[in-house]
Amino acid sequence: MAVKKRSIFEEVGQGAKAPVPQGGSIDRGHGGARRGIRLWLMALFLLVMAMIVVGGLTRLTDSGLSITEWRPVTGAVPPLNETQWAAEFDKYRDSPQYRLMNAGMTLAEFQRIYWWEWGHRQLGRVIGLVWAVGFLGFLAARRIPRGWWPRLLALGALGGLQGGIGWWMVASGLEGDKVTVESTRLATHLGLAFIILGLIAWQALLLGRSESDLLQARRQKDGRLVTLTTVLIGVAFLQIVLGALVAGIDAGRGFPTWPDMNGTFLPAEMFYVPGVETDWRNPAWWLGLLQNPGFVQFLHRMAGYTLAALGLIFWIFGRRSRHRATRGAFDLLAMALLAQILLGVGTVLSAAEWQVAIAHQVGAVVIWVLILHARHLALYPRVGSIRKGTL
């Protein structure tokens, strides 16, 4: 019987076809249309950002009280003829803002402010529709990654809550002798808008990388930078809310000087509340301070200085990261903070002229997103390569 000679270098099963490597359980278990959902979230992000800008312009043009009813569905159709316009104008003429601030306004002037508020509300309806179509579509196709549907559903729930808060805010300016909405309700409305925007941005950042990539990256996270950016998020959110309180009572127009406030560091009557005795133990006095232009403007400035100082200090720590992408994220954040400081000073010196004020608000959105981006890269760093020069 002949014995077949074999080389000691011959591989076992040389003729067999090698099996194709399979992904791990992480990649298999978290499938779905990650790229499609991310694009959908990015569209929602742009719409919410536009909503914040249009909302700011609606406030700056004193248009927010031009529609005196809340009709989420039927309100999507604006007045289409002279009779409908006259009826809508009559409703506005019954409001305190018309009687006390805009008496004698013409129909053409009313139409200009009406379109701002209608556009703001219509944009909200578009956001709701885009969310619903996307969520239900991905859900029906069973393309939502495992564990993600509660997060995406929560975005829609928060959007619905935001619509209700928007009307709650508007309603505060339609009673008594009010000509503007309550500043605290405005701050609640804007604060929730930034929360929604931040959640959308964070989910989009996560979906931009695979689950396995995120898991591996997290093993090299920089805990210190994660903590620092978390602190920065808190300070930035406080500053956003304070900015809304300033805007709600036009406090920026009463102190058009910098770095002083009409010649002093502490504005005159900073702790004065009409009709309420100054008492640190009295809650009514504390609430009344939120309507004091000098008090809220001073807090807004101090919070701005704090945010800028912390941001620049944290930038020094960010520059020490061994990951190039993380260092770049902190560089961008530092530059945005410097630009926002200039816009803030410009807003003060121009007595909150609308062009500068809206640029300042857009700057807040940019900084908010850049802080989240820096935190994301601190938590999930992109590992560079010496060979590719990406360290």
Swiss-Prot record:
> Which EC number(s) does the record attach to this protein?
1.17.99.9
Give the UniProt subcellular location, in the record's own words: Cell membrane
Q: In which pathway does it act?
A: Porphyrin-containing compound metabolism; heme A biosynthesis; heme A from heme O: step 1/1
Q: What is its main location?
A: membrane
Q: GO CC: one term?
A: plasma membrane
Which EC class, in a word? Answer: oxidoreductase
Q: Which reaction does it catalyse?
A: Fe(II)-heme o + 2 A + H2O = Fe(II)-heme a + 2 AH2
Q: Which InterPro entries match?
A: COX15/CtaA_fam, HemA_synt_rhodobact, HemeA_Synthase_type2
Domain of life (superkingdom): Bacteria
Q: How does it sit in the membrane?
A: Multi-pass membrane protein
User: Where do the TM regions start and end?
Assistant: 37-57, 121-141, 152-172, 186-206, 229-249, 298-318, 332-352, 354-374
Q: Does the keyword Ligase apply?
A: no
Q: Which Gene Ontology BP annotations are present?
A: heme A biosynthetic process
Required co-factor?
heme b
The residues the record assigns to binding heme are H300, H360
A GO molecular function term, named singly, is:
oxidoreductase activity, acting on NAD(P)H, heme protein as acceptor
Alphabetic keyword roster = Cell membrane, Heme biosynthesis, Iron, Membrane, Metal-binding, Oxidoreductase, Transmembrane, Transmembrane helix
Q: Name one Pfam family in it.
A: COX15-CtaA
Q: Which PANTHER family match?
A: CYTOCHROME C OXIDASE ASSEMBLY PROTEIN COX15, CYTOCHROME C OXIDASE ASSEMBLY PROTEIN COX15 HOMOLOG
Its subunit composition reads: Interacts with CtaB.
The family assignment reads: Belongs to the COX15/CtaA family. Type 2 subfamily.
Function as written in the Swiss-Prot or TrEMBL entry: Catalyzes the conversion of heme O to heme A by two successive hydroxylations of the methyl group at C8. The first hydroxylation forms heme I, the second hydroxylation results in an unstable dihydroxymethyl group, which spontaneously dehydrates, resulting in the formyl group of heme A.
Protein's name in the database: Heme A synthase
**What organism, scientifically named, is this protein from?**
Cereibacter sphaeroides (strain ATCC 17023 / DSM 158 / JCM 6121 / CCUG 31486 / LMG 2827 / NBRC 12203 / NCIMB 8253 / ATH 2.4.1.)
